């Protein structure tokens, strides 16, 4: 029998990847019901082990740009268990507490990670925000959110539907007459005081109309460079970021 042995489980409400050595096992588990698809894990991962869902862009039908709705948003996850280093950074930075590292079958809380104990990462300065559905979110990033209405011409509603805090709303009730035809226009509202700057809307937008900026990661305490410094740069998002 050869080691390490790898396995994947993507059935049910959780996804898991596992690597089994002769004496020890390491596992990353994703709770799909908690995950919003914000892709903080994708950006932060030092091994680029996570794969993200790519929203399908608009298509032209009878001269109009439309988006075919998907019934379910896809969540990011690790497709090759050997790509992951099982360091646990993804569990440390996940705003929605959707990821867990298991060592020999036992869950390791983020504050007990070896990364924390060895001071490879500092302490996150976050505030707990309780959502209407009862979930709590760790908000430790700051930035801004705007929308380019000229690029948002499809009415897909992805951003409003995926936003966990209700910061984005759309009102498709404005009807105007153009070129002799009546057309429905979207009125988009962003209540930035509700924004968690998690990145879910940024990831779900198929046209790049949403311009999310994450320019500050809040933390304090000692840490060892360069691991955390590089993670911070990966966590940030600029309006021109086309990697999503």
Task: Name the predicted role of every residue range.
Residues 1-23, 57-244:
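Flanking helices and flexible, charged tails adjoining ferredoxin-like Fe-S electron-transfer domains
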């Amino acid at each position: 029998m050869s080691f390490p042995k790898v396995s994947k489980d993507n059935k049910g409400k959780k996804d898991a990847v596992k690597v089994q050595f002769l004496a020890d096992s390491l596992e990353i588990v994703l709770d799909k019901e908690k995950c919003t698809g914000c892709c903080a894990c994708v950006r932060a991962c030092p091994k680029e082990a996570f794969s993200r869902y790519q929203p399908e862009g608009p298509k032209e039908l009878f001269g109009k740009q439309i988006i075919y709705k998907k019934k379910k948003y896809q969540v990011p996850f690790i497709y090759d268990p050997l790509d992951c280093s099982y360091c646990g950074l993804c569990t440390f930075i996940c705003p929605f507490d959707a990821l867990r590292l298991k060592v020999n079958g036992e869950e390791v809380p983020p504050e007990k990670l070896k990364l924390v104990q060895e001071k490879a990462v500092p302490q996150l300065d976050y505030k707990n925000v309780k959502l209407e559905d009862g979930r709590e979110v760790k908000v430790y990033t700051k930035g801004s959110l705007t929308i380019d209405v000229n690029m948002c011409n499809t009415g897909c509603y992805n951003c409003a539907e995926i936003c966990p805090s209700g910061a984005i709303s759309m009102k498709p009730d404005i009807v105007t007459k153009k070129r002799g035809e009546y057309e429905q226009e979207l009125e988009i509202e962003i209540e930035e005081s509700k924004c968690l700057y998690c990145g879910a809307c940024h990831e779900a937008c198929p046209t790049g109309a949403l311009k999310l900026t994450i320019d500050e990661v809040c933390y304090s305490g000692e840490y060892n460079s360069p691991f955390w410094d590089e993670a911070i740069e990966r966590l940030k998002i600029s309006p021109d970021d086309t990697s999503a």
